[in-house]
From Swiss-Prot:
Disulfide bonds: none
One GO biological process term: defense response to virus
DNA-binding in keyword set: no
Entry keyword set: Antiviral defense
Species this protein is from: Paramagnetospirillum magneticum (strain ATCC 700264 / AMB-1) (Magnetospirillum magneticum)
Listed name of the protein: BREX protein BrxA
Amino acid sequence: MAEPRYKADIGGGSLKLPESRIIAGLLLEGVTEDQWRHAIEVENVLQRRSPGTAKRQSSLMRNRLETMGPELWQMVRDGSTQVAIQAVFAAAIKHSTLLGDFLDLVVRDQFRMFRPDLPRKMWDQYLEQCRNRDPLMPVWQDSTANKLADCVYRILVEVGYITDSKTYRLKSVRISGEVMSYLRENNEQYVIRCIQVSI
């Protein structure tokens, strides 16, 4: 059975760099499933208030990072803030075509047209276009669509493409050479296209 191109799995959280560094560390250590569960639920390495929240957020971050390889995980764990956040961003794009296509089709167009901002209404228009492209896309309630928008716009603030979460002003971002080298060496053409929308 065909899978929908667009899913709501990005709604579980923004890039969460400090926590993603911890998850990348566990992946690099090659922990067993039991060791993973112990670290997340017993040691509470993410410092969450409930085991359920810790499990849910760690699962999202793990699924994101596992779309890439150990070289990128090392950038996340050990890199500078800029390199690490861009490495997590690259993994998030590969993990979620809902995020990737928004960058490629909407954010890129705003930069190309020299428009100064990214109004929230563009997200609603984008979701309508997604449904036209993908008949299998789930029909989401308004609350879910708004939550997804919150998450995507927060990610764009974290990476620097949006400088002000109130006015949604756009800013060009230069992706670090380390991240770009990894993406080129691993032939991540979709991610390369989506991550460089301000060029």
